[in-house]
Amino acid sequence: MAVFTPPSGNSNSTDHTHTQDDHDKDDNDIKKFYIRPSLGLKLWGPLVPAPDNLPGLYTLITIQSAVGFFALWRLRRLYKLPPPRRIATGTHSDLSFGELPSEMIVNGKTKIKKDIADFPTLNRFSTTHGDIVLAPPPIIPRQSRFVSVRKLLWGLFGSLLLSQSLLELTRLNFLKYDPWCDEMKSVRDKKFFNNIVKYYHEGIDPTKIKVKDAMNGTPLSTNIPEVKQSVALARAQVEAQNPIIKWFGPLEYKPMSFNEYLNRMEFHLDMFEFFQNKRNIRENSIELINSISHNPQSSSTGLEGLSESKKLHLQNVEKRLHFLASSGDSISAPVKKRSSTTLSRGVILPHDTKGPQDIDLDTIRSLYDPWMTLALETSLSIKFIPTTMPSHTKTPTSTDQPLPGPTPKALTNEKTH
């Protein structure tokens, strides 16, 4: 006889606390938003669209390129040389911005009209007028440090934006395989089917959704499995067409790291190179065999530049080809007597058919298509519901009643003849 001692209340409260903390942690992980991966749009931060959202990517690339060109245009304006000084031409002279009215250039020398009385070291009461000759102005005008810093910032900013836009365009247009794009497409499909299962088990609220027959308009019961499946599919499609979901993809999606991206790209390139080399070897082998079989006299002259092992191999291939050709001409195929003009598959041949060469394969296949025969003789009814369940779905206990409709693992095949 055994005595069962229930656990103390403290342990229950501790377990409940841990369970609640784990649940809150899972909710926080689900609500966490990850920045979508990109090579040249990282400056946009969380506004970067999903890797398979091509309209969104091209929109951001266009805006980023326009801002980069604007920055270079501002740099060009800062690098513009200042306008020339006022040049005296006869009685007319042009006045440029930032100059004194009395400043002009005559015969390559800068002169400033000044009154001697304006200088305090000279006679203040003198009314004599004269020209003060200054040194010629520098070819490259001196600029302040602030202008130099502005040039540097505008140049770096514009070059950075344009280089990033070019990098992203290269990824979108020149890469035949993009791991980020393929991953996002698979995540969207999984999310779509998970939503179907989720909405199917949630059921239909009669106060919010009413289902009517498309033929006569009579209301249908919301407990019918087919109706629940149709409503779940419609709700999943509406959520997939949400503008936020179309722009970012599923919000809980966590993209792969850049290292994993590079590893997948490297694996794809290695496999592509492997299959390409295999295809080239096969084509070269077929071409070599055809050349040997058609020109046996010239094949011996082409063996001079090859190694000994390759020479022996090609000679063996040539001998086998000649043996097969000679044996095929000397030995005739045995003639079999056909007792009936009806094949085992129900194909009726014409009465004048004496050999395989008298059969019109195109006509026979059009009349006795095996796939069409299989389709007419077979009727399949397959119902498939994904087994993926949402994480927050309540696990049924032994006392809970099973929900109506098919189970998540239901897969029925019905075959009738």
UniProtKB/Swiss-Prot annotation:
Region Disordered: start and end of each range? 1-28, 391-417
Q: Where are the membrane-spanning stretches?
A: 57-73, 152-169
User: What top-level branch of life does the organism fall under?
Assistant: Eukaryota
UniProt KW DNA-binding keyword: no
Q: Where found in the cell?
A: Mitochondrion inner membrane
Question: GO molecular function terms here?
Answer: misfolded protein binding
This protein's membrane topology, according to the annotation, is:
Multi-pass membrane protein
What keywords is this UniProt entry annotated with?
Membrane, Mitochondrion, Mitochondrion inner membrane, Transmembrane, Transmembrane helix
Q: Which residues lie on this side of the membrane: Mitochondrial intermembrane?
A: 1-56, 170-417
Kindly report every residue range on the membrane side named Mitochondrial matrix.
74-151
Here the segments flagged for biased composition (Basic and acidic residues) are 15-28
UniProt feature, compositional bias: Polar residues = 391-401
**Which family is this sequence assigned to?**
Belongs to the MGR1 family.
Any additional notes?
Answer: Present with 3410 molecules/cell in log phase SD medium.
Q: What is this protein called?
A: Mitochondrial inner membrane i-AAA protease supercomplex subunit MGR1
Q: What taxonomic lineage is listed for the species of origin?
A: Eukaryota, Fungi, Dikarya, Ascomycota, Saccharomycotina
